[in-house]
């Protein structure tokens, strides 16, 4: 996925993104809890607003986001390709020499990025920096839970890779390659990790024909 501004709205895009995300939330719910409450969005808005939310909205739990984009890559493309050309790795992860653009990686890798302000680009960071960011940002929220942000970052990495692997395997049976994707995670008051925002949509993933 990359940042591009289209000249006009995409008809029914909200419905598409919601349907795709809901599909993956349901299919991958055994891996990590997610934000969905199961509440019908039409039940929490005024009657004259129901048409606006129908098929394009969810009612989500209030969760505290981790301050990272949890990117998983299965192929060398995009900013990962640029990093590989310059350093021979991606986000500090060494990779085999001689890989071509769009080559499949030996195994999926977790390459976190910062959560940039609106209008700015996310910046790839090392896993160690991602852990430091999570430790600092979540310290007060995790006080008294026995958990810390660095460990939750590691938990998010493991969950993200497993989510990607299962999704990619299923997509392959439908003639689709998921080259890479971006997940976001949040925590509840007990410090339990949840998958939030969207999941494996065209806005957060690269889909290629197999």
Write out the residue ranges for each language-model feature.
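A long amphipathic alpha-helix within ATP-dependent nucleotide-binding catalytic cores
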Residues: 140-179
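Active-site loop/lid in soluble adenylation, ligation, and acyl-transfer enzymes
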Residues: 1-117
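Short, glycine- and charge-enriched coil/turn segments that flank and shape catalytic ligand pockets
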Residues: 44, 151, 189-192
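Catalytic activation segment of kinase domains across protein kinase-like and atypical kinase folds
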Residues: 183-210
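Phosphate-binding core of ATP-grasp and ATP-grasp-like enzymes
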Residues: 106-121, 161-177, 199-204
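Residues forming anionic-ligand binding surfaces in small-molecule and nucleic-acid pockets
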Residues: 1-4, 101-147
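Active-site acidic catalytic loop and adjacent metal/ATP-binding pocket
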Residues: 72, 174-191
């Amino acid at each position: 996925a990359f940042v591009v501004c289209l000249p006009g709205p995409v008809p029914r895009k909200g419905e598409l993104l919601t349907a795709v995300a809901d599909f993956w939330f349901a299919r991958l719910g055994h891996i990590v809890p997610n934000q969905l409450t199961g509440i019908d969005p039409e039940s929490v808005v005024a009657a004259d607003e129901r048409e606006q939310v129908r098929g394009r909205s969810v009612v989500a739990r209030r969760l505290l986001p981790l301050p990272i984009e949890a990117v998983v890559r299965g192929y060398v493309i995009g900013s990962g390709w640029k990093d590989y050309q310059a350093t021979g790795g991606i986000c500090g992860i060494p990779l085999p020499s001689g890989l071509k653009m769009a080559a499949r990686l030996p195994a999926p890798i977790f390459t976190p990025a910062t959560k940039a302000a609106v209008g700015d680009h996310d910046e790839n960071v090392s896993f160690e920096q991602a852990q430091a960011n999570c430790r600092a940002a979540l310290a007060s929220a995790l006080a008294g839970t026995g958990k810390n942000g660095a460990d939750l970052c590691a938990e998010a990495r493991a969950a993200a890779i497993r989510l990607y692997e299962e999704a990619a395997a299923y997509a392959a049976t439908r003639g689709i390659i998921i080259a890479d994707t971006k997940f976001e995670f949040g925590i509840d008051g007990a410090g339990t990790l949840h998958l939030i925002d969207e999941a494996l949509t065209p806005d957060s993933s690269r889909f290629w024909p197999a």
